[in-house]
């Protein structure tokens, strides 16, 4: 399991710890990942995803998983999230 968000693609970044004496040592900045269960209204199912805390706030802000995935750029999404997005688009097309 990689250390990256399935919805936003946010991942590990590298940088330096800088001491008071300006000594630099390498370090990693890890994303704040949470295992959450999100509900798709269009599909009527629950999905367990590993997302960052910032992505979770964005999902809530946009009005749920369906709205977030429909508005998201497909290149940033994981393969699993892309599949979910395609299923939601297909279901919406059938309903219309």
UniProtKB/Swiss-Prot annotation:
GO terms for biological process: translation. Keywords: Ribonucleoprotein, Ribosomal protein. GO terms for molecular function: structural constituent of ribosome. GO terms for cellular component: cytosolic large ribosomal subunit. Residues 1-22 have a biased composition (Polar residues). Belongs to the bacterial ribosomal protein bL28 family. This is Large ribosomal subunit protein bL28.
